[in-house]
Regions:
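Hydrophobic faces of well-ordered beta-strands that scaffold small-molecule active sites
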Residues: 19-21, 88-90, 129-132, 158-160, ...
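Active-site gating loops and adjacent loop-to-helix segments of metal-dependent hydrolytic enzymes
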Residues: 24-70, 202-220, 259-280
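Catalytic metal-binding/acid-base residues of hydrolase active sites
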Residues: 24, 163, 199-200, 249, ...
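A general structural motif
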Residues: 223-225, 265-268, 287-291
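Aromatic-lined glycan-binding groove of carbohydrate-active enzymes
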Residues: 230-278
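Active-site gating/metal-coordination segments in enzymes
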Residues: 86-225
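Mid-to-C-terminal alpha-helical segments outside catalytic/metal-binding sites
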Residues: 2-21, 28-87, 115-123, 144, ...
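Active-site acidic short loop of glycosyltransferases
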Residues: 155, 189, 240, 303-304
Length: 356
């Protein structure tokens, strides 16, 4: 593969198209939309409190150093070639969720994000698919935004965080919230993929040192959000829902035995139809768990047909060599190929021009 070709070669898998399902872009138009908006400075102050000054001082230069990789299509293609990746499913940086925005501004945010990602896909239609955004803080607008991403912009689905502040200071929107039922139903009806990618954590200052706001919070938020989906019965009511959890689903998949035990012994946890661990086979997870042993444990917990390749490129907490890291796990060749691209293809995440 070259950095400028519009074709794919099957990467390094002998014919399997290698698909990175977890890769980010910054959509400049989104930042133009929110610039100067009421509420932006308050949100930045909250982010500073959550991340801590030390981490915030690192984040700015880190983003600046990666800005071309986040915004320049030619550089992105070069990165993909170096990594042995044929296809990226590109999603906006989670920093562009802007869940603080009111309904009117939120509509401008998702329209800009969805069209920005669609422009990347349209520029190289054999190399990219994409996820758009929806305003999780406004449950009544989710279906409209989902339709915008999938039906109007032609994207594969949307990216959401693990929770959002409630509209107008109301109750927090968890993924178990009944107000999300129309969204889950519509996503299942469309066959749209929902990428669960946490951003932020409600523990705030407890994690404001040592970058715990990311290293601990991201996997914790994944575990909490997935638990809300499981225990509330969302997956019972919407069995066709296609949800991919970033970061390997965090802490939940390899420690779900405790959830099973609670389901068996406590009536307040016996709220879903089956053992919580059984729902791992109704979800999908990316491979970004950072060690070969952790990836093997994830595959043992959920099955290789429930794992997709993910890099979190080009951020510093991501990896530039997702295929090499997959190979380092020493999986069965068939399982390895499923993770490299076969599972993603089954989810409909190949570019539309490559789908049979």
């Amino acid at each position: 593969m070259s950095g400028t070709t519009s074709g794919t070669t099957g990467g390094t898998t002998g014919g399997t198209v290698v698909v990175d399902v977890h890769a980010h872009a910054i959509v400049p138009e989104v930042e133009m939309v929110v610039a100067g908006a009421a509420g932006l400075e308050a949100q930045r102050a909250l982010d500073l409190r959550r991340y801590g000054r030390e981490s915030a001082a690192v984040n700015g230069p880190m983003i600046a150093a990666r800005m071309r990789r986040l915004t320049d299509l030619g550089v992105r293609l070069e990165d993909m070639a170096a990594a042995g990746v044929d296809v990226q499913v590109v999603s906006p940086s989670p920093s562009q969720y802007h869940y603080w925005a009111d309904a009117d501004l939120a509509r401008h945010v998702w329209r800009a994000a969805n069209r920005g990602i669609a422009a990347i896909v349209d520029a190289e239609p054999l190399r990219f698919n994409g996820f758009g955004l929806v305003p999780l803080q406004h449950p009544d607008l989710l279906v409209e935004a989902l339709d915008d991403a999938v039906e109007l912009c032609g994207l594969a689905g949307v990216e959401i965080s693990s929770y959002a502040p409630g509209p107008d200071g109301g109750r927090t929107v968890e993924l178990s919230d009944p107000r999300l039922e129309p969204f889950w139903a519509r996503a299942a009806e469309l066959g749209a993929v929902v990428l669960l990618h946490p951003f932020g954590c409600s523990l705030d200052e407890r994690l404001d040192r040592f970058y715990l706001s990311n290293t601990v919070a991201q996997p914790a938020e994944n575990a909490v959000a997935l638990s809300h989906l499981i225990f509330s019965g969302v997956l019972d009511r919407h069995p066709r829902l296609r949800l991919v959890a970033a970061h390997g689903g965090g802490y939940l998949p390899t420690y779900i035995g405790r959830s099973d035990h609670a389901w068996e012994v406590r009536p307040d946890a016996h709220t879903c139809a089956e053992l919580p661990s059984s729902y791992l086979r109704r979800l999908w997870f990316d491979s970004l768990v950072h060690t070969p042993a952790a990836l093997r444990a994830l595959v043992a917990a959920v099955g290789a047909d429930r794992v997709v390749l993910g890099s979190d490129a080009p951020f510093d907490m991501g990896v530039d060599d997702p295929v090499a890291r997959l190979d380092a796990a020493g999986l069965d060749p068939a399982d390895r190929d499923r993770i490299a691209g076969g599972t993603a293809a089954g989810l409909g995440l190949l570019p539309r021009k490559l789908q049979s």
